[in-house]
Amino acid sequence: LKVTALSVFLYIGVSAQNIQNNPGSNHGNRFEQLGTILPTPNVYRTASGAPGQAYWQNRADYDITAYLDEEKRNLKGSETVTYHNNSPDYLDYIWLQLDENQQSTIKKTDYPFSSTLPKSTTNQQLKTSDLPAKDNGYGVNLEKVTDASGNPLKYTINKTMMRIDLPKILKKGEKFIFKIDWNYNIPNRIEKGGRGGYENFPEDGNDLYTMAQWFPRMCVYSDFQG
């Protein structure tokens, strides 16, 4: 059995400095007014786009131990996440990304749950809209989701998103520590596509692993998108 172990500590600033969405833009109309495109200045962002006097970013620290089983082509991880609420808001839940669920036939986002179809669709979209007959074995398997003391946390998974309900309100300036144990089978990147996976080299008898978005990670919480 060939197993590789690695430890990772990450700091990620969850930015509130994103550009506001502009659904009303004509995208290419040379006479379009700029009033709806430029973000409205506020205490968080000035008209120039520079941080304002009340600018904030939420923060997430990750302490990750990961094991790569090359024979089974499986990645197993245990991570401790420290989430800092620097926003002025009270938070009673948080969201995480489970990107690897897009590789699953039962957890991915490709097929609609609605009984209706859009007015315009393709043969490929019709094929992917069929519910799969069985699980193809891919996607994130959550082994444990607990707080820092080991108490189970209530969570809900919606395709590639996971919502964790906090045991108590997370106020401004406070932090919440939780742990997640997980694993997933690594897909063939050449066959299935995507940013991460393995590429097999039969002549060498080994695989090349190019892993991206490989661990459960915090979603951005911002002042204008929530």
Language model: regions and residue ranges:
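Bacterial Sec-dependent N-terminal signal peptides
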Residues: 1-21
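N-terminal, polar/Ser/Thr-rich
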Residues: 17-75, 205, 212-215
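Extended, low-hydrophobicity, Ser/Thr/Pro/Gly-biased non-transmembrane segments
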Residues: 34, 118-144, 148, 181-226
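Short, solvent-exposed loop/turn and secondary-structure capping segments
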Residues: 93-94, 106-109, 156-157, 188-197
